[in-house]
Amino acid sequence: MADTSQKPDKATSAAQARQVIDVFHEISTLLNAELDRGTLSICISLIENGVNPEALATVVRELRKDADEVRRQIAQGVVQDGE
């Protein structure tokens, strides 16, 4: 027979995790951090697993700068297929 005592715990944990993500998403929105719930979830998981939050923030900023540069190049027609 299956252990049903685990089901409420899993449901409660999932609800709490969603609530935490919602709170972080609200904070992200207020700070104009432009992080969606999925990205926040990944960032939180990385931090919980020992990634330095400041280093993670630096990586996110660098990735955004790189993405902005690629978008600019595409808009100017600089980037071609395969580059």
Curated annotation (Swiss-Prot):
Belongs to the MOZART1 family. InterPro entries: MZT1. This is Mitotic-spindle organizing protein 1. It is found in: Cytoplasm, Cytoskeleton, Microtubule organizing center, Spindle pole body. Required for gamma-tubulin complex recruitment to the microtubule organizing center (MTOC). One of its GO terms (cellular component) is cytoplasm. Keywords: Cytoplasm, Cytoskeleton. It comes from Sclerotinia sclerotiorum (strain ATCC 18683 / 1980 / Ss-1). Pfam families: MOZART1. It comes from the Eukaryota. Part of the gamma-tubulin complex. GO terms for biological process: gamma-tubulin complex localization; microtubule nucleation by interphase microtubule organizing center; mitotic spindle assembly. The keyword Cytoplasm applies.
